[in-house]
Amino acid sequence: MKFLFDLFPVILFFITYKVYGIYNATAVAIIATFVQIGWVWLRHRKVDNMLWVSLAIIVVFGGATLIFQDETFIKWKPTVLYWLFAAVLFLANQIFEKNLIRVMMKDQIRLPEPVWPRLNASWAVFFSVMGIINLYVAYNYSTDTWVNFKLFGFMGLMFAFVILQAILLGKYVEKSDDQEI
């Protein structure tokens, strides 16, 4: 359910684009992100930093799209977001010696210490590549194709990457004392 909630602005963007075009879809995505943050705040009295970053990026790039009536800005939004994620993962690890993937996943999975830096790096590379793929699709295909890819292509790539990670990590997962072998 959280997965669908996280996709709420993207799904509304997609539906609105199909009916009303890119500019209305952009406005809806901005509004939907504000609504999403409001809902999270009302329920938890706390909003994850990644949601705030998403809001800032959609407001800046979506706002530029609407002000200048140029869809190029909104097409850059996923790339900026993915590259920002990649940079944060990389820099947090290199400069602050903080493995953010480990911080986020340590309660869900137990891995040997040497695996965590590789997992962090693989996510940083994945987000970097996703940004490049977004630009490739945005500049080489129609806006309609880009919008379809934004929802279905990125979701498919993310799903495939998570499955691949699960398979590769399977051999490293440490059993806890209360798990049966």
From Swiss-Prot:
Q: How does it sit in the membrane?
A: Multi-pass membrane protein
* Compartment list: Cell inner membrane
- Which key words tag this protein in UniProt? Cell inner membrane, Cell membrane, Membrane, Transmembrane, Transmembrane helix
**Record flagged with keyword Transcription regulation:** no
Top-level taxonomic group: Bacteria
The regions listed as transmembrane in this protein's record are 24-44, 49-69, 72-92, 119-139, 149-169
Query: Record's Gene Ontology CC terms?
Result: plasma membrane
Q: Does the keyword RNA-binding apply?
A: no
Q: What does this protein do?
A: Plays a role in cell envelope biogenesis, maintenance of cell envelope integrity and membrane homeostasis.
The cross-references to PANTHER family, in alphabetical order and at most eight, read: INNER MEMBRANE-SPANNING PROTEIN YCIB, INTRACELLULAR SEPTATION PROTEIN A-RELATED
Q: Which HAMAP family match?
A: YciB
Which family does the similarity line name? Answer: Belongs to the YciB family.
User: Which protein is depicted?
Assistant: Inner membrane-spanning protein YciB
Question: Species name for this entry?
Answer: Nitrosomonas europaea (strain ATCC 19718 / CIP 103999 / KCTC 2705 / NBRC 14298)
